[in-house]
C-alpha cells in the first residue's frame, strides 16, 4: 500500500485561525495515497529522496507542528537552527502543505535560497519551477505518474498545482538500489535496451537516466 504524508487542514477544518500545534493529530499526518495530482517531482539522488520522506514522517509525528496558512513559515523559522529537522522542534508552530514540502527539500540538501524568497516558502504554484531550477530533480506529468501510484517511489513529491502537495513515504514499488556504475555496465551489455526505451526503463526503475548515460559514456571512452 502506498502512503503519503502532508500538511492537511487545521483543527476546525479551515486553512487558518487555529491554535499552533497539531490539535487533532491530523493537521499534519500520514494517510493512504489518492490520485489527484498533475505533477510528480523526484529527486535524482536516491539519498535525497529518502531524506525528503524522512522529514515528512518526522513532521507528521511531531504534535508541535500544526496547520495554518497565515503562519506557514513558523516551522521553517524554528527548525532552521536544527538543520531543518522537524523532529527537534518543540515550540508549537505552523506550516501548510507546500511550506512543509519546502522544508523537506531543504532537509534533503536543497539550498534555502532556491526555494524560500523574501522569507516565504515556495507554494504549490511555484514549487515545480523552483525545484527544476536547482537541477536536482526529474519532473513527470504523464497520467501513469500523476493518476496512479504504480510508478511512484518513496520521496516522490506529488503536486496539484494551485491546490495541494504531499510526499510518498511508503510504497511497495521497486526502488533503485544498484550503484550507477553497476547499472551503466548493464547498459553497456545491452540489458536496458536502447534509445527512448532505455530512458523509460531506467527512469521507471528510479534511476537518473542522465547520470547513468554519463557513466556509460565514461566506460565506453575508457575501452
Pin down the residues of each PLM region.
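N-terminal capping segments
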Residues: 1-116, 161-163, 174
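Short alpha-helix capping/helix-loop boundary micro-motifs
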Residues: 138-148
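Loop/turn positions that initiate beta-strands
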Residues: 154-156
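Extracytoplasmic Gram-positive cell-surface binding/anchoring modules and repeats
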Residues: 188-199, 207-209
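Repeat-associated, polar segments at repeat-unit boundaries in modular proteins
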Residues: 205-223
Amino acid at each position: 500500500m502506498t502512503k503519503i504524508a502532508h500538511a492537511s487542514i487545521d483543527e476546525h477544518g479551515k486553512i487558518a485561525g487555529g491554535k499552533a500545534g497539531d490539535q487533532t493529530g491530523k493537521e499534519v499526518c500520514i494517510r493512504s495515497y489518492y490520485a489527484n495530482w498533475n505533477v510528480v517531482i523526484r529527486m535524482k539522488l536516491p539519498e535525497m529522496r529518502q531524506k525528503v520522506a524522512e522529514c515528512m514522517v518526522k513532521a507528521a509525528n511531531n504534535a508541535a507542528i500544526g496547520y495554518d496558512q497565515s503562519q506557514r513559515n513558523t516551522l521553517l523559522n524554528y527548525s532552521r537552527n536544527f538543520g531543518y529537522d522537524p523532529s527537534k522542534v518543540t515550540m508549537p508552530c505552523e506550516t501548510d502543505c507546500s511550506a512543509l514540502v519546502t522544508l523537506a527539500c531543504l532537509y534533503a540538501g536543497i539550498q534555502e535560497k532556491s526555494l524560500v524568497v523574501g522569507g516565504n516558502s515556495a507554494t504549490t504554484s511555484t514549487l515545480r519551477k523552483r525545484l527544476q531550477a536547482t537541477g536536482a530533480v526529474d519532473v513527470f506529468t504523464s497520467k501513469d505518474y500523476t493518476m496512479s501510484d504504480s510508478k511512484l517511489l518513496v520521496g516522490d513529491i506529488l503536486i496539484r498545482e494551485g491546490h495541494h502537495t504531499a510526499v510518498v513515504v511508503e510504497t511497495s514499488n521497486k526502488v533503485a538500489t544498484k550503484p550507477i556504475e553497476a547499472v551503466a555496465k548493464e547498459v553497456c551489455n545491452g540489458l536496458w535496451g536502447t534509445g527512448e526505451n532505455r530512458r523509460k526503463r531506467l527512469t521507471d526503475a528510479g534511476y537518473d537516466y542522465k547520470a547513468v548515460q554519463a557513466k556509460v559514456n565514461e566506460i565506453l571512452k575508457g575501452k
